[in-house]
Amino acid sequence: MAQKDHPNGPKKSASASSKRWMYEHVNDFYVKEATKKGLRSRAVFKLEEINKKDKLIRSGMTVVDLGAAPGSWSQWAVDTVGLKGKVIACDILPMDSIAGVDFLQGDFREDAVVNALLARIAGHKVDVVLSDMSPNMTGTVGIDQPKSMYLVELALEMCKEVLVKEGSFVVKVFMGSEFDLFMSEARKCFKSVKTRKPDSSRSRSREVYVVATGYKG
């Protein structure tokens, strides 16, 4: 449920920074690789690298993917869990269907959407919760970081509802004033909590991925 790239988000005139971003994007190695492999975005390589290091997602698992659009994480996850596994995805934005992925469109900040997602899970526990959610960015850290942390905290609350004991959680976090507090909260719930900065994450970006394993239940 990527609050990212929302069609109603703030519109900015073409600036030097946006032109630089576009130049880097079209010349980006990971963008080219994703296009060549028929994947929906370069973000897939972040999850692939994290999973290679931490071995979180395996055949037969059930995975919840929050902030799923345009779908590259769900694509990768459903291929990895195979026919005996399950992927349930959610995003505020529409997402083209992916075979084997149960997709719910809605705003994860709304109780009705969370309840609908829980209904899709149908009382079963899941092995991994993924969250690549991000708010519409204004460029003002004092606004963007709290909005981002709110989504991170909602994803952690979802873990408490649905994760199997010893389950795992991967969440995108933007470094800022509330980061240490979130890490402290995550450590109360998981045996191991670490940060990852995948090679495919742009170096200028303040994003990191928190990888939490061994859910205490």
Swiss-Prot record:
Coiled-coil region list: none
Active site per database record: K172
GO molecular function: rRNA (uridine-2'-O-)-methyltransferase activity
Superkingdom, taxonomy of origin: Bacteria
GO cellular component annotations of the record: cytoplasm
Keyword S-adenosyl-L-methionine included in the entry's annotation: yes
Subcellular location as annotated: Cytoplasm
Binding site for S-adenosyl-L-methionine: G71, W73, D91, D107, D132
Reaction equation(s) it catalyzes: uridine(2552) in 23S rRNA + S-adenosyl-L-methionine = 2'-O-methyluridine(2552) in 23S rRNA + S-adenosyl-L-homocysteine + H(+)
Keywords carried by this UniProt record: Cytoplasm, Methyltransferase, rRNA processing, S-adenosyl-L-methionine, Transferase
Documented EC number(s): 2.1.1.166
Annotated S-S bridges: none
Assigned protein family: Belongs to the class I-like SAM-binding methyltransferase superfamily. RNA methyltransferase RlmE family.
Protein name per Swiss-Prot or TrEMBL: Ribosomal RNA large subunit methyltransferase E
Lineage of source species: Bacteria, Pseudomonadati, Pseudomonadota, Gammaproteobacteria, Alteromonadales
